[in-house]
A protein has these predicted regions:
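Helix-turn-helix DNA-binding module
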Residues: 3, 111, 115, 127-144
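Short, small-hydrophobic-rich alpha-helical interface motif
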Residues: 22, 26, 37-48, 67, ...
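Amphipathic, Lys/Arg- and hydrophobic-enriched alpha-helical face
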Residues: 14-34, 50-51, 110
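DNA-recognition helix of helix-turn-helix
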Residues: 69, 138-162
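Sigma70-family region 2
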Residues: 4, 32, 43-60, 78-80
Length: 168
């Protein structure tokens, strides 16, 4: 299949419109620093570009989120395969558009959750996805999303009770 100029333009428009939102999600999925989140998004966008001719227009957002979740999972796995561990730094809090005064504390607490639990919480409560959409993005069952979300919120509430009463 021949790649068309229209497809390149469509992909560029999609990236311009959605990149910032994808970086916000990645910054919460891969706590450490904003540069790592941007690397995850770049990897995800590269995968999306390759698949672009096959992606239906009505599913492109879901496909992009799945690419980000998969790239974040790959990043997380690669940390354990390395001999040296880099010290984590907090992401640029302004880049994730906090809704609470204690956004740095929330980001720090999210970093303490296991990767799959963090992904479920971020996709459900930061991105506002449904259980089905989150399950699709994480490639797991809806029941797994529900339990991971509930356990994640439980851990966050225990560590940060004053600000978590309105979530969930």
């Amino acid at each position: 299949m021949r790649w068309s100029v229209d497809r390149d333009r469509e992909f560029t428009e999609f990236v311009m419109a959605r990149r910032a939102a994808l970086v916000r999600v990645a910054a919460l999925l891969v706590p450490g620093d904003l540069a790592r989140a941007e690397d995850v998004v770049q990897t995800a966008l590269t995968r999306l570009y390759v698949a672009w001719p096959r992606v239906r227009p009505d599913t492109v957002d879901a496909y992009a989120r799945r690419c980000v979740v998969n790239a974040a999972t790959d990043h997380h796995r690669s940390l354990f395969s390395r001999r040296e561990q880099v010290r984590a730094k907090l992401p640029d809090v302004a880049a994730i558009e906090p809704r609470h005064g204690d956004a740095a504390s929330i980001v720090t607490l999210l970093a303490t959750l296991p990767a799959s639990m963090r992904a479920a919480v971020v996709l459900r409560y930061v991105e506002g996805l449904s259980v089905a959409e989150t399950a699709h993005a994480m490639r797991c069952s809806e029941g797994n999303v529900k339990s991971q979300s509930a356990r994640g919120l439980e851990r966050l509430r225990a560590a940060f009770p004053a600000h978590m009463r309105t979530v969930g």
